[in-house]
Amino acid sequence: MHRDLEDSEATAALGRTIGAALEPGHCVLLTGDLGAGKTTLARGVARALGVAGVVPSPTFALVIEHAGRVPLLHADLYRLDPGAPIDDLGLDRDDAVVLVEWPDRNLGALPADHLVVALTDQGQGRRAALHATGPRHAALLAALSR
């Protein structure tokens, strides 16, 4: 599934659409270059999950847990060395929605069943390409495609 996003509001709106469909145990991986809109999309997800207040980038904290209709774990692995251990970050929790920016730093340690949102610059906007690995997130992607 692809979506063209004309501006940051469209990126946040896609995040809200995704967030409205998420349930505990879902894992969403956000990929894209610096400035691609990962954190903007994450903020949209957070709003749809009922997170109030500021949703900062977790770049320096690595993981920030937010309270909402379900807990949201928002992680940013950018500062980690590739392959660095992440077992103690709680990214395998099934009682929360897990949202990971820069998952390529340690993809092998993340849940195998997940949704990927790849953001790319298109000059006058962005393109979001969504794909799922595993049956649970394939069902999520099918629901988002309707």
Q: Regions from the language model: what does each represent?
A:
Residues M1, A84, D92-R146:
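Short phosphate-coordinating micro-motif centered on Lys-Gly-acidic
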Residues I18-G25:
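Phosphate-binding P-loop
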